[in-house]
Amino acid sequence: MSSILPFTPPVVKRLLGWKKSASGSSGAGGGGEQNGQEEKWCEKAVKSLVKKLKKTGQLDELEKAITTQNRNTKCVTIPSNCSEIWGLSTPNTIEQWDTSGLYSYPDQTRSLDGRLQVSHRKGLPHVIYCRLWRWPDLHSHHELRAIETCEYAFNLKKDEVCVNPYHYQRVETPVLPPVLVPRHTEILTELPPLDDYTNSIPENTNFPTGIEPPNNYIPETPPPGYISEDGEASDQQMNQSMDTGSPAELSPSTLSPVNHGMDLQPVTYSEPAFWCSIAYYELNQRVGETFHASQPSLTVDGFTDPSNSERFCLGLLSNVNRNATVEMTRRHIGRGVRLYYIGGEVFAECLSDSAIFVQSPNCNQRYGWHPATVCKIPPGCNLKIFNNQEFAALLAQSVNQGFEAVYQLTRMCTIRMSFVKGWGAEYRRQTVTSTPCWIELHLNGPLQWLDKVLTQMGSPSVRCSSMS
């Protein structure tokens, strides 16, 4: 390998001297072959950046920012259309559609453009250099937010993107206000069964590459088949243009019960040790043990690592009832899907060469779709599939409506996701249990919060039984 890196310029050595190790200190980490490969990769990444910045005269500004650790330094930019510079193929774009028509979001097609490739490893340039010089444990661009003075921040989608690591900050998880729950609430005389969309025929949606709708997109009325039982819920960007309130734009504190004279008890949210649990299915059969996710970033893939806390490897799992269709589908899972839990939000990114299909009631609520809508995520694209703050607002609102309304929210805490093969109205397979390979996520934090709220509210006056 020494022939590949015959000479390291002094400026590269200086910049590498400020590289943060996993322990948070500057300089190189420990030994070992893996660390040696990582060091060589970091050197290549820095060399590549230095070469570009020398051409634009920004190298001194980068070195100043890193050595002074000062956010008041200037932007340090490289071209954002790195798909051409680095020989990457044009990333997939996604269109949103359903049985009633086509909806296009052209403004969102660049959200995953500009990935940088260094020695067969791809990543967004500002993430690579923030990880190198500030946060070694950084997983995704979702964890970063640009400072207000950054003129070429990644989220601005300009022709140049700033890679000054001190122009970005880590996203902090927002503190959710407690939900005020009356100790005794008037309960419906009978608790209807929980809505189950497993066997319903969902609509299908292809979602834009970006995880947010454009600012100017406000659906006047949902398309046919997209009537949400909870009403339209819009993202924060959409709410800025709306006159009437929706659950997503109201904070939990504004939706707390207003029953005067009642004994209101605050029920707080707390993060569990495992933020989600994942079960794997082949057709209608559960396969293997439940995977409990403790890391903020994890992948569900088709490979065979048995002991990595950041990977749920489906390739290891055996099933005596596995048929040829399932076997063929498993071969195409590949790198699968990456799940992020960052800042109270859950994202799904398709790493596979084949699309993944997601049914997320929380996401569907946000865009005013039917709760059973299935969203297709092509390779290289990502989607926000859950938001704690939106859920908190809905929970606080539902407390006013009684035990049954709160109980119905449990369906929002379950997300189904199939690999390679989709299901729904536009597919031969009508239900998720007809797809060869799929997973079910249970979001433990929201589920435990619901449990505490329901416990505080008390049981329904008439319990469900075989006779009710």
From Swiss-Prot:
Extent of Polar residues compositional bias: 234-244
GO cellular component, as recorded: chromatin; cytoplasm; heteromeric SMAD protein complex; nucleus; transcription regulator complex
Subcellular location: Cytoplasm; Nucleus
Record bears the keyword Zinc: yes
Domain MH1: 10-177
Disordered, as annotated region: 224-254
Residues that, per the record, bind Zn(2+): C75, C150, C162, H167
Residues of the MH2 domain: 275-468
A molecular function (GO) term: DNA-binding transcription factor activity
Keyword Metal-binding listed: yes
One GO process term, biological-process aspect: convergent extension involved in axis elongation
PROSITE patterns referenced in this protein's UniProt entry, alphabetically: MH1, MH2
Signal peptide: none
SMART domains: DWA, DWB
Keywords: Cytoplasm, Developmental protein, DNA-binding, Metal-binding, Nucleus, Transcription, Transcription regulation, Zinc
Family that this chain belongs to: Belongs to the dwarfin/SMAD family.
Function: Promotes differentiation of dorsal tissues. May be involved in the mediation of Ndr2 signaling during mesoderm and axis formation during embryogenesis.
Name of the featured protein: Mothers against decapentaplegic homolog 2
